[in-house]
From Swiss-Prot:
It comes from the Bacteria. Keywords: Acyltransferase, Biotin biosynthesis, Pyridoxal phosphate, Transferase. Substrate binds at R31, H134, T349. It is an enzyme of class 2 (transferase). Homodimer. The gene is bioF1. It comes from Mycobacterium tuberculosis (strain ATCC 25618 / H37Rv). This is 8-amino-7-oxononanoate synthase 1.
Amino acid sequence: MKAATQARIDDSPLAWLDAVQRQRHEAGLRRCLRPRPAVATELDLASNDYLGLSRHPAVIDGGVQALRIWGAGATGSRLVTGDTKLHQQFEAELAEFVGAAAGLLFSSGYTANLGAVVGLSGPGSLLVSDARSHASLVDACRLSRARVVVTPHRDVDAVDAALRSRDEQRAVVVTDSVFSADGSLAPVRELLEVCRRHGALLLVDEAHGLGVRGGGRGLLYELGLAGAPDVVMTTTLSKALGSQGGVVLGPTPVRAHLIDAARPFIFDTGLAPAAVGAARAALRVLQAEPWRPQAVLNHAGELARMCGVAAVPDSAMVSVILGEPESAVAAAAACLDAGVKVGCFRPPTVPAGTSRLRLTARASLNAGELELARRVLTDVLAVARR
């Protein structure tokens, strides 16, 4: 046996992790977990609880009631024992709210994207994905065994070229409606025009659109595209609805097909009833209190002005680009020390040289919280931008 081979055998099979961790630390890309307290001790401008519903009494009560009626867990795949009347009622109610014909719940937004993209593509088909699509869409494309073309960010002409030159009979264009790193909107109307020109399906991830755009119904609804026969919507229950889970919404045949073909649906345990009950209650609060989506956008605009961001936000998110990872990490830490928790995005989540703070607005922010945010952000960014 060669000496180099013997040395590799003698080493721990995980020895390589030490070098990887050193490289991450040197690049300012090391991550760690920070448990949040049960009672917040700082102002939250980092979570995705856009409508402020995760602690709403009605939402908590909805989860508790479902827990008492249906038990703690789904107990199995929805095809075995994990389906309940509650699941199907909420699917129908959410579909009606966003203007879709039908919906199918998954255990997370991530698995909803995996199930939808892989289930609607496969060998012999083409997937066209935006360069800044969410990681769940990226992974879904990789798992699909379809040919994948990644187009430049928000480049409709590149999507058109990919579809025009294809040999595959089936094609699916996938995009976020609201891109998570900077809160920008996808050119959804233009993408659908291109898809229709070439006979392709459009799949739109509304994770950051639901509850904020279109009066809470999402960007597709706002653009008058909800319920289109050649559009599929995915979204999560973990952001605006303050719960957990994911859903695919679209034509009724899509739901029927995914029940038979989506592996994350077939083989995963069904979504816990408490999560469904909480999300259902949150949807009812949103319907009863339609002021919440506009409040999110209004507060996002205030946060942008505090940070000197000229563009009016199109979503709950405000992106403050600082450049290198170390600058963003230091600024986020300084904000936290001063009582304001903000998001910190670094590569590979965002391109190199664009590490940033990401602030997320909530409908429930009050005047005192906004004033605290103004003081802290003004001081921290003055130092970070020197």
